[in-house]
């Protein structure tokens, strides 16, 4: 089985066959030499048995059939078509001296040896042929197996190539995913930066509104104090009973004007309360998860919200503390008196400041009308 492995061992097989053939021929030659070297007996040779002649004849017939089948003889008419032996075909080999020729034991022995050698060679050739056919068959089987293995290797190589393509595709997908992750991270950073900017803008805006409200409150307190002081300075006691109805009339007129002014002040107070409530509501939701942190366009309440506000139950100090607690976490940076707002926030702030200034101007005008009324009343009394 070792010598039929692949095509590289074919020369070894041929060499082995030739080596066996030469060993076999050498054994036959040594055997014949030993027989020739044996001492000859002086006794007369025994007569040839008919059985020996028949065996030589049968062997010659078998050998001639084999040689003829293998094409060793010529097909020409004047050529021999079989192997002639001196012991059997002496008349054909030496026809001129056939009558005087005597076939000896040596002739028969020689013919027998020739037949044995040819028979052995034919058998060796048959064995070599079978050996060669077997070897070729095994080689063909090995070649088929090699071809099958090659096909299998080719299939495996295709699978490996496909796996490599899949790996490359996965690597490309990973690179794309990394790029998308970086893009989304950049977007997240931008959103966080915008949120911080909006938070800072809102914080500044809230502080500005808070200061503006406090200025308005201080201005209202100042005007109320001024009005109260003027009333105290201008008020004078009257002993005359006749003047009491007129003074009562003046007090009623002044009371009506003050009631009207008080109504305006209550309306303004309700607006301020509504602004504070809206601001408080927005600050509570600002910065919470899944909440709309967009700064509203205005904090001025609607008419329906004003009707629902009861200023008598409004505690300014309480809401001031609440707003202070809500704005305290946002007060991370120092705030100057100069603010920079975006265009829309600046517009809203300007509108609210303008509205507050208009209300303040109306209050001042009302105050002036009150003073004018008091002067008219004073002049009227002097005329009386």
Swiss-Prot record:
| Keyword Protein transport part of the UniProt annotation | yes
Principal cellular location given in the protein's record: membrane
Concerning Pfam families, the annotation shows:
ADIP
Keywords from UniProt, A to Z, are: Autophagy, Coiled coil, Membrane, Protein transport, Transport
Subcellular localization, as worded in the UniProt entry: Preautophagosomal structure membrane
Q: Which InterPro entries match?
A: Afadin/alpha-actinin-bd
- Where along the chain is composition biased (Basic and acidic residues)? 236-247
Q: Where is this region: Disordered?
A: 224-247
Annotated membrane topology is: Peripheral membrane protein
User: Does the keyword NADP belong to this entry?
Assistant: no
- Entry GO CC: phagophore assembly site membrane
A GO BP entry is: protein transport
Q: Which residues form a coiled coil?
A: 132-236, 342-379
The text of the family note is:
Belongs to the ADIP family.
General function of this protein: Specifically required for selective degradation of peroxisomes via macropexophagy.
Descriptive protein name: Autophagy-related protein 25
List the source organism: Pichia angusta
Q: Which gene encodes it?
A: ATG25
């Amino acid at each position: 089985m070792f010598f039929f492995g692949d095509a590289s061992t074919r020369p070894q097989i041929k060499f082995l066959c030739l080596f066996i053939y030469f060993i076999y021929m050498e054994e036959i030659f040594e055997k014949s030499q030993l027989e020739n070297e044996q001492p000859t007996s002086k006794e007369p040779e025994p007569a040839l048995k008919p059985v020996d002649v028949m065996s030589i004849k049968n062997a010659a017939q078998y050998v001639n059939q084999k040689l003829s089948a293998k094409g060793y003889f010529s097909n020409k008419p004047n050529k021999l078509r079989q192997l002639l032996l001196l012991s059997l075909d002496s008349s054909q080999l030496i026809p001129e001296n056939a009558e005087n020729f005597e076939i000896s034991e040596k002739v028969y022995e020689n013919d027998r040896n020739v037949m044995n050698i040819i028979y052995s060679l034919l058998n060796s050739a048959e064995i070599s042929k079978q050996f060669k056919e077997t070897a070729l068959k095994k080689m063909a089987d090995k070649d088929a197996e090699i071809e099958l293995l090659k096909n299998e290797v080719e299939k495996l190589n295709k699978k490996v190539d496909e796996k490599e393509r899949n790996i490359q595709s996965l690597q490309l997908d990973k690179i794309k995913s990394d790029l998308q992750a970086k893009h989304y991270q950049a977007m997240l950073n931008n959103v966080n930066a915008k949120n911080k900017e909006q938070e800072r803008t809102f914080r500044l805006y809230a502080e500005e509104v808070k200061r503006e409200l406090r200025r308005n409150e201080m201005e209202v307190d100042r005007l109320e104090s001024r009005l109260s002081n003027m009333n105290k300075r201008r008020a004078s006691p009257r002993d005359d009973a006749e003047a009491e109805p007129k003074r009562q009339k003046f007090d009623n007129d002044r009371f009506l004007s003050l009631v009207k002014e008080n109504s305006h002040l209550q309306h303004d107070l309700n607006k301020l309360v509504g602004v504070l409530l809206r601001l408080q509501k927005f600050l509570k939701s600002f910065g919470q998860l899944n909440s709309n942190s967009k700064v509203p366009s205005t904090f001025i309440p609607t008419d329906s919200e004003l009707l629902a506000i009861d200023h008598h139950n409004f505690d300014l100090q309480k809401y001031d503390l609440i707003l202070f607690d809500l704005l305290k976490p946002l007060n991370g940076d120092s705030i100057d008196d100069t603010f920079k707002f975006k265009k829309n926030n600046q517009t809203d702030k300007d509108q609210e400041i303008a509205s507050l200034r208009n209300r303040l101007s109306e209050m001042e005008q009302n105050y002036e009308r009150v003073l004018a009324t008091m002067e008219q009343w004073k002049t009227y009394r002097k005329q009386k």
